Amino acid sequence: MEKTLETVPLERKKREKEQFRKLFIGGLSFETTEESLRNYYEQWGKLTDCVVMRDPASKRSRGFGFVTFSSMAEVDAAMAARPHSIDGRVVEPKRAVAREESGKPGAHVTVKKLFVGGIKEDTEEHHLRDYFEEYGKIDTIEIITDRQSGKKRGFGFVTFDDHDPVDKIVLQKYHTINGHNAEVRKALSRQEMQEVQSSRSGRGGNFGFGDSRGGGGNFGPGPGSNFRGGSDGYGSGRGFGDGYNGYGGGPGGGNFGGSPGYGGGRGGYGGGGPGYGNQGGGYGGGYDNYGGGNYGSGNYNDFGNYNQQPSNYGPMKSGNFGGSRNMGGPYGGGNYGPGGSGGSGGYGGRSRY
């Protein structure tokens, strides 16, 4: 059937609805099958899909999978019941990242701090609290103001006691707070940005999924620290990050889709200079090291100007990173494997799974 202008938005809407109901399950035992995975997660609701990702050649488990529930409420119930243990192993469930978002920097990083842009002068802390507390327990709320004038800079941060509210909020994308459209992103610290930058060269460190070599996390069957790969890791080929966790990179580079660094350029996470973006500057800088990258050097998606002083904390930048080669099939097929699109590695290679 030929796709029309009318069917494309309908398909996208259907896919987005499914995305809200899907969980990524990392750290699976190699003994875990679709049947045992399904049996475990059906305690929270009806599953419409369940898959353990396997190497297309050897059929060996890659140590992760996906489950899709019939409703978002069931997903919430499952996430509220963490930790999860399947076949004697504690696993890590996370809300699955949409295919079109998976190549963006920070998409797979687990954080508890949310960046909120588009904050107007009439928006106060209680507006943010009233809106976001339905997603989870809030630890702190910060609306950033100019030190001299006291005026709002148009953005702030909401910190939760868990990463799942942040994952859920950014997955939904569109939010209206106090009558104004808001932009929400994961907020990454300077340290987190630098850790991702260093991933392209395979230098030390831990991104929260395991130790450096030979131990810790278990997100892939490879001998080299599991989650970041080895010879048979998360994305096949060189693994999920090849020595660190560059999310699919080749030997020390290549990362999210084959460009040098995490999204092209020289500096990894957005290329170029320190911080997030391609130039210096900062996202509303001068406030306890918040900002970083080139946020604020111009309008931010029509939400206003966020000033240009240098600083160190900022949102996950949007835009396409890693070449934008569309991943085939419901579980990808490109930007998770070595070099980018459609390879035999990837989040499923060329096949459906």
From Swiss-Prot:
It is found in: Nucleus; Nucleus, Nucleoplasm; Cytoplasm; Cytoplasmic granule. Changing residue 290 to S: Impairs hydrogel-binding. The keyword Ribonucleoprotein applies. Changing residue 207 to S: Does not affect hydrogel-binding. One of its GO terms (biological process) is mRNA processing. A motif (Nuclear localization signal) lies at residues 9-15. Changing residue 287 to S: Does not affect hydrogel-binding. The modification Dimethylated arginine is found at residues 203, 213. The modification Phosphotyrosine is found at residues 331, 347. The modification N-acetylmethionine is found at residue 1. Signal peptide: none annotated. InterPro entries: HnRNPA1/A2_C, hnRNPA2B1_RRM1, Nucleotide-bd_a/b_plait_sf, RBD_domain_sf, RRM_dom. CDD domains: RRM1_hnRNPA2B1, RRM2_hnRNPA2B1. The modification Phosphothreonine is found at residues 4, 140, 159, 176. Changing residue 321 to S: Impairs hydrogel-binding. The modification Asymmetric dimethylarginine is found at residues 203, 213, 266. Residues 193-353 are annotated as: Disordered. Changing residue 313 to S: Slightly affects hydrogel-binding. The modification Omega-N-methylarginine is found at residues 38, 203, 213, 228, 238, 266, 325, 350. Changing residue 219 to S: Does not affect hydrogel-binding. One of its GO terms (molecular function) is G-rich strand telomeric DNA binding. Residues 21-104, 112-191 form the RRM domain. Changing residue 244 to S: Does not affect hydrogel-binding. The disordered region, when incubated at high concentration, is able to polymerize into labile, amyloid-like fibers and form cross-beta polymerization structures, probably driving the formation of hydrogels. In contrast to irreversible, pathogenic amyloids, the fibers polymerized from low complexity (LC) regions disassemble upon dilution. A number of evidence suggests that formation of cross-beta structures by LC regions mediate the formation of RNA granules, liquid-like droplets, and hydrogels. Homodimer; dimerization is required for nucleocytoplasmic translocation. Identified in the spliceosome C complex. Identified in a IGF2BP1-dependent mRNP granule complex containing untranslated mRNAs. Interacts with IGF2BP1. Interacts with C9orf72. Interacts with DGCR8. Interacts with TARDBP. Interacts with CKAP5. Interacts with TBK1. Interacts with STING1. Interacts with SRC. Interacts with PPIA/CYPA. Interacts (via C-terminus) with FAM76B; the interaction results in retention of HNRNPA2B1 in the nucleus and inhibition of the NF-kappa-B-mediated inflammatory pathway. This is Heterogeneous nuclear ribonucleoproteins A2/B1. The gene is HNRNPA2B1.
